[in-house]
A protein has these predicted regions:
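Active-site-adjacent bridging/hinge elements
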Residues: 7-9, 79-85, 194-200
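Conserved hydrolase catalytic core segment
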Residues: 16-71, 80
Length: 200
């Protein structure tokens, strides 16, 4: 899962590339990995920058505003849970079907890019050219990596899901956050985020 990936990347930076200190930036899974770099490896990882909140405080929302955000977030996520549940519980079954079907991989990826993008008039080509769409699809087809890309969901579930450990201590390294217009998931109130990160 992403916590193990963070451990591997930290070792690579320190032992293979000989950096004593580094910063990490990530979105989506990269944000989750950056969170774990900041949490587990702050002796080496000196700052992180993320554009989505993928991890949750173990104590959950505390204020009325935070609780309202959580209710809205949970409601919004219902429409996204199908693919995540499949990949977090049965990634290999899905992978066998996809690796045998380029059209299946294309449909899976295009549906996500369509649903997660700020489209004009519901037209995916208002944001992505056919070349960009095909390049994304072909990366998975030509490298046979739909399978391995799916397993990170399973790994995160095995590592405890979206929540930091119950004995969580705030990530004290400087944290930068980018919030773009029309994000798929709305950020929680700043009070919630500041219980997790040292925002700069």
């Amino acid at each position: 899962g992403p916590r193990k990936i963070a451990e591997i990347l930290n070792k690579m930076m320190i032992k293979n590339l000989n950096y004593k200190e580094y910063c990490a930036q990530g979105g989506d899974w990269g944000a989750t990995i950056a969170n774990w770099l900041g949490y587990d490896h702050s002796n080496n990882c000196k700052a992180i920058h993320i554009n989505c909140l993928t991890m949750r405080h173990p104590e959950g929302p505390q204020t009325k505003e935070e609780k309202e955000w959580q209710i809205k977030f949970d409601k919004d996520q219902i429409m996204q849970d199908g693919y995540r549940t499949q990949q977090a519980t049965k990634p290999q079954t899905l992978s066998y079907a996809m690796l045998d079907s380029p059209v299946g991989i294309a449909a899976w990826i295009i549906e996500k890019m369509h649903g997660w993008s700020d489209l004009k008039d519901n037209n995916i080509e208002s944001v992505y050219s056919k070349d960009v769409l095909l390049a994304n699809i072909m990366i998975y087809i030509l490298t046979n990596t739909f399978n391995t890309a799916s397993w990170i969901y399973f790994g995160r579930r095995e590592e405890g899901g979206r929540f930091f450990p119950k004995d969580f201590k705030k990530i004290n390294i400087p944290t930068g956050i980018a919030i773009f217009p029309n994000e798929m998931s709305e950020w929680p109130p700043r009070s919630y985020v500041e219980r997790i990160f040292n925002i700069k």
